[in-house]
Amino acid sequence: PRQLSLELYGRIPTVEEYERLHGLEDVSEAIIDEMIGSSEFYDQLRRYHRSLLWSNLGDNDLVGQTVERSRDENFDVWLNRQKRDEYRGRDVDCLDMEHTNFDADGRPLAMIENYQEGDCAGGEGCTMDGWVQVQPYWAPGTTIRVCAFDAQPHTDGTPRDNGDPRTCDQSGNDDPLCGCGPNLRYCTARGANYDAVHEALLEEPARIFEEVIAAGEPYMNAFATRATAMNGALAHFYRYLSDDNDAELKNAPELAYDADWQLVERESYHSGILTTLGFLRRFASHRARVNRLYTAFLCDPFEAPSGGLPPATDDCSLNPDLSARCGCASCHETIEPATTHWGRWEEGDDFVYLESIDTFNNNCANCEKGQCSNYCKTFYITRELETTPGSVDTELGKLKTLGWRTEEEVAALEAGPSALVSRPEYQQQLASCAVRNFSERVFGRELTAEERTSWLVDKTASFEANGHDFLAMVKDVVTDDRYRRIE
C-alpha cells in the first residue's frame, strides 16, 4: 500500500489508510478503483504530465504591464514603475494625498505642476498625482490605493497623429492617457496575482490531459482536441493581459477571477496540448517542439550518429538542407518535415497563429546576399543561407519551414500538429510510449530490452483494446505482478 500510495497519490499512506488495509493480504481491486478515481490521483496525474512536458516558463514577463506595491512606514500605494517617467516627467512615485483633480471625463489632472521636491528638483520639476481607491480585479470586494495616473480606467488614449483613435490595452501604448484600465484589468500585480497567472499557464496542458482522461476519451485526443481548460486567472490573462496573443483566445470567457477550471472551446486550428501557450513558449522553436513531442510522447529521442559529424570541410557538410546534410540527416530527415506542422505558429515568445501567410516572397527571393531585410532573413529562404554557389537556388523565396519539402510535406502547413500525431504509425507509437512512460515511472527503472519486446507489446495491445483509456492502463500496470514484486 505504501508504494501504491506514493505512485497514485504522491504521498505515503495515512494512519487511517494503513489501518484499513491491516490484515488484508493484498490491496483489493475495489480499493485500487477508488484510488484511481480520487481527486488526489488526478492531482498526481497532472504533476506526472507536467514532468513529461518539462513545464517551466522561467521568470519571463508574460504581460505588457505590471503594477507593484510600494510601501514604507508612512505610505502604501500601488503603481506601474514602467511608466513613472512617462506620467510624471521623472522616475518618481505619486504623492501621499487623495487625488481630487479630474476633468469632465473623469481623467486625472495634475495635483501639482512643476513639483520641485526631492528627485523632482530642478528644471521643469514633476507633474504630480495623488492616489485613488480601486477595487482590483484579482481581489473583488477589496480596495487598494493606486496612483491616479496609473489607475486611469479609460480605454481610449491620445489620438494618433493622423487623427485615428488609440485604444488603451495591456501594452500601455507609451501613452500617458492610458492606465491599467477598469479595475486595473490591463495590468498584472507582482506579489498578488502574477504567480497565479504563471502557474495557470503551466497547468493548462496538464488540465487538457486530465479532462481527456477523466472523460474516458482516447489518450491521443489530448494532442488533437480543440478544447482547453481555463480558470479565472487564465481567462483574464488571455482576454486582457497577454501582450502577443492573436490565437483567438482574446475571446476567452469572462469568468470570475477565482473561478475554477472549466473546458473552453478554441478555434479549429488548435491541436490539444501542442498549441497551448505554455507548450509553445516553453519550446519556442519548431524544432524544439518536434523534439519534445518525439522524446516525451513517442519515446523516440533524437541522437547524434555514433560515428560523429564529418569534417566541416566535407562538401556534404555544406548542404543548406539539414535533412540531407551529412551528420545531420539521421535526425533532421524526420525533424524538418515535422516542423512544417507548426509552420503557421510563430516561433519565439509570441502566441500567434498566422491565418494569412505568404508561402513565397518575391522580394526575399531576389535580394542579394548581404542586402536582404531582417524580415526576409527571419522567415524566408534567401541567399544569406547560401553555403556554396547555387546551393539555395531552387528554394529562394520559400517560407523557411517549406524549404526542400515535398508536396505532401508542404500540405502539413495547413494540417497542423494534430495531423502529425494522427498518423496510424504514430498512434501506435503514442500508445506504446504512454504505457512505457507510466510503467517506468511506477517501476522506478527503465524497462529492459526483453520487457520492451514482450511485456510492453502485450500491455500496449491491452491499452489499444480498451480504446486507449489511460485509467484502464494505469490499473493494468499497477495490478501486474511486475509492479507487485517491487520491494
How would you label these PLM feature ranges?
Residues 1-9:
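Post-BTB helical module
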Residues 8, 12-445, 449-487:
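Active-site substrate-binding loop specific to GH73 endo-beta-N-acetylglucosaminidase modules
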